Regions:
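Structural motif
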Residues: 9, 146-148, 174
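Short beta-strand edge segments in extracellular beta-sheet folds
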Residues: 30, 196-201
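Flexible, gly/ser-rich surface segments that form the specificity/activation loops bordering the active-site cleft
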Residues: 1-41, 76-82, 97
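PDZ domains, with a preference for the canonical peptide-binding region formed by the helix
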Residues: 87-88, 151-179
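Conserved PDZ fold ligand-binding element
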Residues: 65-68, 138-160
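Active-site region of chymotrypsin-like
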Residues: 24-79, 125-130
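Short, well-ordered loop/turn sites that connect or cap secondary structure elements
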Residues: 5-6, 61, 143, 170
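C-terminal cap/linker of serine protease catalytic domains
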Residues: 67-124, 187-191, 200-203
């Protein structure tokens, strides 16, 4: 369970480490409980002090030999970011991939509405849509950036992780009902309902 990993906890990387296909390295968790929101999914990110190269890949284990994450090395401009994706945040994705049934895709990127943000901007409960991919199922259905999604097929959406799991449990061609709130010209929120025909998740 990667959600229980604490700061300064010892971790071990096994796999391709420092270009060694059978390499390993030990280190510790510098930061935990950081969320990275991507299209249709949210990752729990752990930052460690383990040095990895751009072409490295490794499984990350805790001191009790329990799998807690997968290395995630990306290059953004000239910067190489070396993080770990918490295994608990991608459990549903792994299960769906293992089943051989491709997961559905909606094409939205969202962020959680924290209590502070809700109070500061008077946002209702739900998750805030930051981006809708052009020509995605959500785009074709009418969803927009700025919408606040609070219900998915009758289920309450309390966090981006909830939403991600719901999407991953859907399949291509499924029609799902999305309830959301959208601000009008006067700043008031209108409740809207859309039917989205799910696409295919390719990664």
């Amino acid at each position: 369970n990667s959600y229980g990993v604490k700061q300064n906890e010892i971790v071990i990387a096994l796999g391709r480490v420092q270009s060694n296909a059978k390499g390993y390295a030990a280190g510790y968790v510098k930061e935990n409980n950081t969320l990275e929101n991507d299209v249709d999914i949210s990752y729990d990110i752990l930052e460690t002090n383990i040095e990895l190269k751009e072409d490295d890949y490794a499984l990350i284990f805790g001191v009790n030999a329990n799998l807690i994450g997968i290395s995630h090395v990306t290059k953004v401009g000239d910067e190489i970011r070396k993080n770990v994706i918490g295994i608990s945040s991608v459990k549903t994705l792994i299960e769906e991939m293992s089943s051989g049934i491709p997961a559905g895709s909606m094409g939205v990127k969202c962020t959680n509405i924290t209590k502070d943000i809700s109070e500061q901007f008077n946002f209702p409960e739900g998750i805030y849509v930051t981006e809708v991919e052009v020509d995605s199922p959500a785009y074709k259905a009418g969803l927009q950036a700025g919408d606040i999604i609070y219900e998915y097929n009758g289920g309450t959406v309390g966090s981006v992780q909830d939403f991600s799991d719901m999407i991953l449990m859907s399949e291509k061609g499924d029609s799902v009902t999305i309830k959301l709130k959208r601000t009008g010209r006067g700043g008031e929120y209108r409740e809207l309902e859309y039917t989205v025909k799910m696409g295919l998740r390719l990664d």
